[in-house]
Swiss-Prot record:
Its EC number is 2.7.7.6. One of its GO terms (molecular function) is DNA binding. It comes from Saccharolobus solfataricus (strain ATCC 35092 / DSM 1617 / JCM 11322 / P2) (Sulfolobus solfataricus). GO terms for cellular component: cytoplasm; DNA-directed RNA polymerase complex. It is an enzyme of class 2 (transferase). One of its GO terms (biological process) is transcription by RNA polymerase I. This is DNA-directed RNA polymerase subunit Rpo6. Belongs to the archaeal Rpo6/eukaryotic RPB6 RNA polymerase subunit family. The keyword Cytoplasm applies.
């Protein structure tokens, strides 16, 4: 019985390592929504746009924030806490 439990724990640890390696450089839909909404709020409060908005078809703050996110010009870093206590920092700015 104890051996089966150890095998299950070993499989769970392996799954967690694979999951972390797959998602380490990708954002979840919730992180993307949070970043875009935070940037849209900044724009609505008067922050300057980081892209040229004259070429955009729509100039509402959410469209501008989405385009800034797509182009990778946002100077935002996401701190992701993992269940094992490890912290991963993800920069949204593309080099």
């Amino acid at each position: 019985m104890g051996l089966e439990r150890d095998e299950i724990l070993s499989q769970d640890l392996h799954f967690n390592e694979v999951f972390i390696s797959l998602w380490q450089n990708r954002l979840t839909r919730y992180e993307i929504a949070r970043v875009i909404s935070a940037r849209a709020l900044q724009l609505a409060m008067g922050a300057p746009a980081l892209i040229d908005i004259n070429n955009l078809s729509s100039t509402d703050v959410i469209s501008i924030a989405e385009e800034e996110f797509r182009r990778g010009v946002l100077p935002i870093t996401i701190r992701r806490r993992l269940p094992n206590g490890k912290i991963i920092l993800l920069s949204l700015r593309k080099s």
